[in-house]
Amino acid sequence: MNTNKATATYLKSIMLPETGPASIPDDITERHILKQETSSYNLEVSESGSGVLVCFPGAPGSRIGAHYRWNANQTGLEFDQWLETSQDLKKAFNYGRLISRKYDIQSSTLPAGLYALNGTLNAATFEGSLSEVESLTYNSLMSLTTNPQDKVNNQLVTKGVTVLNLPTGFDKPYVRLEDETPQGLQSMNGAKMRCTAAIAPRRYEIDLPSQRLPPVPATGTLTTLYEGNADIVNSTTVTGDINFSLAEQPADETKFDFQLDFMGLDNDVPVVTVVSSVLATNDNYRGVSAKMTQSIPTENITKPITRVKLSYKINQQTAIGNVATLGTMGPASVSFSSGNGNVPGVLRPITLVAYEKMTPLSILTVAGVSNYELIPNPELLKNMVTRYGKYDPEGLNYAKMILSHREELDIRTVWRTEEYKERTRVFNEITDFSSDLPTSKAWGWRDIVRGIRKVAAPVLSTLFPMAAPLIGMADQFIGDLTKTNAAGGRYHSMAAGGRYKDVLESWASGGPDGKFSRALKNRLESANYEEVELPPPSKGVIVPVVHTVKSAPGEAFGSLAIIIPGEYPELLDANQQVLSHFANDTGSVWGIGEDIPFEGDNMCYTALPLKEIKRNGNIVVEKIFAGPIMGPSAQLGLSLLVNDIEDGVPRMVFTGEIADDEETIIPICGVDIKAIAAHEQGLPLIGNQPGVDEEVRNTSLAAHLIQTGTLPVQRAKGSNKRIKYLGELMASNASGMDEELQRLLNATMARAKEVQDAEIYKLLKLMAWTRKNDLTDHMYEWSKEDPDALKFGKLISTPPKHPEKPKGPDQHHAQEARATRISLDAVRAGADFATPEWVALNNYRGPSPGQFKYYLITGREPEPGDEYEDYIKQPIVKPTDMNKIRRLANSVYGLPHQEPAPEEFYDAVAAVFAQNGGRGPDQDQMQDLRELARQMKRRPRNADAPRRTRAPAEPAPPGRSRFTPSGDNAEV
């Protein structure tokens, strides 16, 4: 799929055929042209007001359907006409195949004198052929299917229905369009020759029993031998041999006429009749043979054929009693074929649209559009440019996966026309990889489509929509890590520095001198993908596989393989179905691309690509598009499996290389890439790694790892599991199992370092950071609201740089450090007993004066927590420094703006000092003193206590007017 356009063009052409054709991206790369053909019919409604449209949505030729009317009594159908494309394709083209098709069926033309249209439409898609439909009445049409997505009922004719062709298969061959071949000048006038539609024909064969022919009632009257269903819409060829013998010699020559009638839906009038006549005489009555050989061109198939009838008659009355017995000279049979009948879409499935109670003589409009891939005939090819189809497995598989989820996404074959028009916006979103699927989110389908895109479509095209121009450069750096799987589950490369390459071009790394390594460079073409869940094997071993892509230097990625006992070549891709042998022919292994240099245990093993190990022990294996496994890790796994593993599968991935002595394991490269593959399954990578295990005995490795290998499987969580290995992968220098792979990765690292100072490096890191932190949706919504980045620019112009606050030790370590510090101080002061443990028991306090005096006097260690007050001098009752006590008392009581503290309060403060040995009050004692002060201030006064009054205010001096000047009262 072209990620520059970021559009699934093939899927878009299927769901929106009016947008035009797009080449089918499969591996049929014929030169062709793309052509869109229209079909437009105005069908006149009969007097009954009812009829049926038979649509062939997948037919690759020009005939796309047929129209039938019900008779006036609605007791029988009458064929009206074929529905075909505007151009007869076989006139100009030799081969073709259908890409997509759509019909719109609606009525909007009023007959003269009417003001409104009546009538309704029923439509249903039937998975079988037309002859298998039991009833074509309006009401019984809905019983053809139980799938609600394949039927529409009681839709007004003015609203209309839409029929959409959804492919039933994607293996579509080019079919011959029954074109006429050039003829010579001496040909008879009117004679012509055509290439018949003989690709995948549907063949019918009527086998008659070896018994008596049923008697005829009279001469010239047909007697039926067989009558049954058959579907034919294209040319057919009839061949047959009906042989019989008469019981008696005929009196006269008797003519036997065997007649094969091809009939349609509407009546018993044959569309085409094939007759074979033979004379029974005295010479041949013991073995008479009637041969049938006739070709019927498409022009003679004037309506869809749904029934055949084989009958016979005779011309002699005397021969009626002469018994004829079939099969005298061999089987009696008649066969005929339906051209292209087994091509998907030619005869099945079909869509039936019935209309009822429409106004007679009103018009029913059928407007269709069909998209084709066509190969012109030689005459037209001289003046027309053709192009090869592009093989795009991603585009094809994305279409497959979307259409395989048609029920969840509500993609239908028949629609109410207004619903289909409403859904076109969703279809455009699904096929546009740069869309964030806002409409699909409203319908509840965004998660499904996103999940499919992650598997089958380029992830970078949906990673950062506004960075679409950078996609081509992004896949050089981190694209390989974020876009990991191709359509259908096939791996893509995931090493840094390389473009995306399908495993079609990859090769499992190994020794170049392997027995099969060179012969298998030209691998088989295969596109099959399967997953198979197997029960827990009796034993097994998991090894990593490193793949490289020679067309892209530096390309490398990893996967896992599990080697189990048994022969399972059918579970391997055709490229991996290689059988290798142990030394001295002591066993074999499927899926290994080189012979094993040591002896086996006379058993056969199979190396299968591993996808998942479930908790119950079941293993899920898959077919991947890659070559067979080669390399030292596979040989190490086989050595452990043959010599050491007796039961079960160790939950770990083994890597390493067995030395020549077959006992020593030497270092091996590729640890980083193998670790990514192992960690995705929640498995550890175990074995000989550079700098970890320089040299380990084979037996000791098995004893140490296998016996303890009971680790539970824990799958990596999150959708960004590959991103977190980016730093490790870029920093590593070891990514291969041989010198060639090491050289390739060194080139990758050098190329990655070249862009570290470029602006693109910052953009790519930003994209990775955005996806890693799940900010893609938020950034995309912000970009729509702030297209000029004015708000965002102001927001991030000064990024926050908060220095990280140093984290101190936790409480336990802090207390231990405190105890150690107090212990050192106490020991320096002479208290040798004060160890950190003793300080901790003493409530993390140093020795008190009593404890220190006790130690000095007795020489024994004091008990932690005991103050030994008897060994210290009792404090004085009232300290001599009363000034200090008064200052504190006045401060607590409330001076200097309130009354001085009473003597009782001084005494209370002095008592606190005495209690503390001369020290001031602690926090609790200070709170008690403040409470005592408040109580003393609220204490009521005695009546004898004089109340202090204020002195009266002095009167103000007499004022004067500011207009009266000072001096005498003289006249101004």
From Swiss-Prot:
Top-level taxon of the source organism = Viruses
**PTM:** Specific enzymatic cleavages yield mature proteins. The capsid assembly seems to be regulated by polyprotein processing. The protease VP4 cleaves itself off the polyprotein, thus releasing pre-VP2 and VP3 within the infected cell. During capsid assembly, the C-terminus of pre-VP2 is further processed by VP4, giving rise to VP2, the external capsid protein and three small peptides that all stay closely associated with the capsid.
Report disulfide bridges, numbered on this chain: none
Phenotype upon changing V288A:
In strain: Isolate Sp116
- PROSITE patterns found in the cross-reference section: BIRNAVIRUS_VP4_PRO
UniProt-annotated binding residues for a divalent metal cation = D26
Chain intervals for the UniProt region annotation (Disordered)? 794-817, 916-972
All residue ranges annotated as the Peptidase S50 domain in the record: 509-734
Extent of Basic and acidic residues compositional bias: 801-817
* Assigned EC number: 3.4.21.-
SUPFAM superfamilies cross-referenced by the UniProt entry: Positive stranded ssRNA viruses (SSF88633)
**Can the keyword Protease be found in this entry's annotation?**
yes
Q: What is the effect of changing D672A?
A: In strain: Isolate NVI-016
What keywords appear on the UniProt entry?
Capsid protein, Host cytoplasm, Hydrolase, Metal-binding, Protease, Serine protease, Virion
User: Which biological processes are named by the entry's GO terms?
Assistant: proteolysis
What does the annotation give as the result of altering L683A?
60% loss of pVP2-VP4 and VP4-VP3 cleavages
Additional remark text: The sequence shown is that of strain 31-75. Isolate Sp103 is VP5-deficient.
Protein name, UniProt field: Structural polyprotein
